[in-house]
């Protein structure tokens, strides 16, 4: 199952023609780390159009649940369940309680995506036992660790292409920093900046919005050819995140990975092989963020 997390809502007909198994988009104010945002008036028609094309619709609900918004989250969950969406990406465990209170059967809508926190098959199995649809694994696991997780919990999901979340903070880190260096006029909410650590060469995309500060990985994650042994281990859900890369890039990734899984590595063009060259680590460690070297 290929899931395409959109970067925008443009060219939806092109996306329909490409036939991903599912798309992911956001709805304010419950989403995070997405630019493909719809509203309550447009969403029902969009769900119907995608369902007519045989494409599932999943909703990004990755913003944290604050007590002041608990009632709004509860009402939004009910609306989405009645609307017939196919999945809800969540990072806050509070959504499990909301789903259980609404109707225990709706726990099957939840796809747990806590970014770097889901590091073992046991973690994933816990959420699977609650009745959730899928559990998105950490992006910093080695090939062997990922295979072990999938064998323990076959309902796991993996980001196979795209930026991943490096850090989230409710604090206004960018605005505070620019104020501290006496350049407050350089701050703009939602503007994309880059951040470079002293011990790393890459530049990490960073922005600040009403939710706080978001930092993404300095490089695009690629599962590459390791998706083949992961599929052999039982992995069935592959997510492509188009954020900052664009929907066209996502469709190129979709085509390449479909070719890889259906026809094998030899069927890939040289350009495709280069584009999806794996960034999965070979050695085992859960602390990639603090390392400036390693063996892939």
Predicted region positions:
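Active-site pocket-lining/capping segments in soluble small-molecule metabolic enzymes
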Residues: 1-122, 136-296
């Amino acid at each position: 199952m290929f899931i395409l997390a959109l970067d925008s809502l443009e060219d939806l007909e092109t996306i329909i023609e490409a036939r991903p198994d599912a798309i992911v988009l956001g709805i304010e104010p419950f989403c995070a780390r997405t630019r493909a945002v719809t509203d309550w008036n447009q969403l029902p028609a969009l769900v119907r159009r995608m369902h007519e094309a045989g494409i599932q619709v999943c909703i990004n609900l990755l913003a944290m649940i604050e007590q002041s918004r608990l009632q709004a989250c509860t009402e939004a969950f009910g609306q989405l369940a009645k609307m017939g969406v196919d999945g809800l990406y969540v990072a806050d465990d509070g959504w499990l309680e909301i789903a259980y209170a609404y109707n225990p059967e709706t726990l099957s809508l939840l796809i747990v995506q806590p970014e770097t926190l889901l590091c073992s098959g046991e973690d994933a199995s816990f959420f699977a036992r609650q009745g959730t649809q899928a559990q998105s694994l950490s992006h910093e696991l080695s090939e062997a660790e990922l295979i072990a997780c999938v064998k323990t919990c076959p309902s796991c999901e993996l980001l196979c292409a795209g930026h991943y979340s490096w850090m989230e903070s409710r604090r206004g880190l960018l605005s505070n920093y620019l104020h501290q260096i006496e350049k407050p006029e350089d701050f703009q909410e939602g503007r994309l900046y880059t951040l470079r650590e002293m011990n790393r060469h890459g530049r990490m995309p960073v922005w600040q919005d009403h939710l706080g500060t978001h930092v993404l990985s300095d490089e695009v994650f690629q599962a590459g050819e390791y998706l083949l042994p992961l599929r052999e281990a039982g992995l069935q859900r592959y997510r492509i995140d188009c954020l900052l890369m664009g929907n066209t890039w996502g469709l190129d990734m979709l085509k390449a990975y479909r070719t890889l899984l259906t026809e094998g590595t030899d069927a890939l063009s040289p350009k495709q092989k280069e584009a999806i060259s794996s960034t999965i680590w070979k050695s085992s460690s859960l602390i990639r963020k603090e390392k400036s070297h390693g063996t892939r």
